[in-house]
C-alpha cells in the first residue's frame, strides 16, 4: 500500500496506539519477548483489533533497515494522519503557539524538532511540501513518540500560509542572527508562530519578508550556530516562560 510507512520502537508505537490506533495497519513483535512493555503493546493492540505478527530478530532488522527497533515495529496508514491547520487553530483553548520549519530536510533534525515541539506544547509544526524531510520511520524514532502527538502539516505555498496565519492574529517571528531584537530583550506576543530556517542558508527570502519580527538568539561562545532543534527549544521555552509570567501577573 503506497500510503503505508513503518514506525519502530516503544515510544513511537505506544504513542500511535494511544493517539491514533485506527491508523495502525499491523504490528510485528519479536518472538520470545514477554516484558511489561511488550505485554502492554499486545494488550492495547488486541483491544483495538490490530493485527499482530511475531517475527524473528532478522526479520525485524530487515523491516527497520538496521535501526534500533526494540523488538516492535508497526506499519501505519499515513492517509489517516492528515490534519487541517484551520481545525487546529479553531479548537484551541489558549493562544496558538506554532513552529514553522523552512528548509529542514534532514529527518533527524525534523524528529528532534517534533520532540522539542511536543515538550513545549506547540500546537502544530508546519513545513513546505517541497522543502521538508517528510515523516518517515527515522523521524518517528528520533521524535520518541512526538511524531504521533504533534500535528505535522505540510503546505503547498508557505508564504500564503503565513498570510493566513496573520489573519488569525498570529505574529510571524523569524529567527535570524542579524535580527533587530534579541530573544532576551523582546516582549513576545501571546499568539506566535516561530520560523526556523536551515543551519546553512537560514530562511528563504520570501519567508523572511513575511515575518513580523526578526529575533536573534544571543551567543556567548565561539560557535556561530546551533542545531535547529536546540534553537527551536530556546525560543519556544522563552515564549512559554513569558506566558507564565503574564498569567501570574493577570
UniProtKB/Swiss-Prot annotation:
Keyword line: Cytoplasm, Methyltransferase, rRNA processing, S-adenosyl-L-methionine, Transferase
EC number, as in UniProt: 2.1.1.185
Signal peptide: none
Molecular function GO labels: RNA binding; rRNA (guanosine-2'-O-)-methyltransferase activity
Binding locations of S-adenosyl-L-methionine: 197, 217, 226
Keyword Transferase among record annotations: yes
Entry's localization field: Cytoplasm
Coiled-coil blocks: none
InterPro entries assigned to the protein according to its UniProt record, in alphabetical order: 23S_rRNA_MeTrfase_RlmB, Alpha/beta_knot_MTases, Ribosomal_eL30-like_sf, rRNA_MeTrfase_TrmH, SpoU_MeTrfase, SpoU_subst-bd, tRNA_m1G_MTases_N
CDD domains found in the cross-reference section: SpoU-like_RlmB
SUPFAM superfamilies documented for this protein: alpha/beta knot, L30e-like
Catalytic activity: guanosine(2251) in 23S rRNA + S-adenosyl-L-methionine = 2'-O-methylguanosine(2251) in 23S rRNA + S-adenosyl-L-homocysteine + H(+)
One Gene Ontology term, aspect cellular component: cytosol
Its biological purpose: Specifically methylates the ribose of guanosine 2251 in 23S rRNA.
Family note: Belongs to the class IV-like SAM-binding methyltransferase superfamily. RNA methyltransferase TrmH family. RlmB subfamily.
Protein's name in the database: 23S rRNA (guanosine-2'-O-)-methyltransferase RlmB
Amino acid at each position: 500500500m503506497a500510503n503505508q510507512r513503518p514506525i519502530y520502537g516503544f515510544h513511537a508505537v505506544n504513542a500511535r496506539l494511544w493517539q491514533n490506533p485506527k491508523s495502525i495497519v499491523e504490528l510485528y513483535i519479536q518472538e520470545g519477548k514477554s516484558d511489561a512493555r511488550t505485554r502492554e503493546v499486545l494488550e492495547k493492540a488486541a483491544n483495538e483489533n490490530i493485527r499482530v505478527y511475531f517475527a524473528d530478530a532478522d526479520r525485524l532488522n530487515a523491516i527497520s533497515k538496521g535501526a534500533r527497533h526494540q523488538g516492535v515495529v508497526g506499519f501505519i496508514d499515513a492517509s489517516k494522519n492528515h490534519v487541517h491547520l484551520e481545525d487546529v487553530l479553531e479548537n484551541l483553548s489558549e493562544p496558538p503557539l506554532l513552529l514553522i520549519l523552512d528548509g529542514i530536510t534532514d529527518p533527524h533534525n525534523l524528529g528532534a524538532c517534533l520532540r522539542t515541539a511536543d515538550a513545549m506544547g506547540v500546537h502544530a509544526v508546519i513545513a513546505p511540501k517541497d522543502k521538508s524531510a517528510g515523516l518517515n520511520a527515522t523521524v518517528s524514532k528520533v521524535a520518541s513518540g512526538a511524531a504521533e502527538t504533534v500535528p505535522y502539516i505540510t503546505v503547498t505555498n508557505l508564504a500564503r500560509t503565513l498570510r493566513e496565519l496573520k489573519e488569525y492574529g498570529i505574529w510571524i517571528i523569524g529567527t535570524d542572527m542579524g535580527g533587530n531584537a534579541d530573544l532576551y530583550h523582546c516582549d513576545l506576543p501571546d499568539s506566535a508562530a516561530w520560523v526556523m530556517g536551515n543551519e546553512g542558508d537560514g530562511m528563504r527570502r520570501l519567508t523572511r519578508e513575511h515575518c513580523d519580527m526578526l529575533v536573534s538568539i544571543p551567543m556567548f561562545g565561539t560557535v556561530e550556530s546551533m542545531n535547529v532543534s536546540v534553537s527551536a527549544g530556546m525560543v519556544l521555552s522563552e515564549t512559554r516562560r513569558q506566558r507564565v509570567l503574564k498569567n501570574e501577573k493577570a
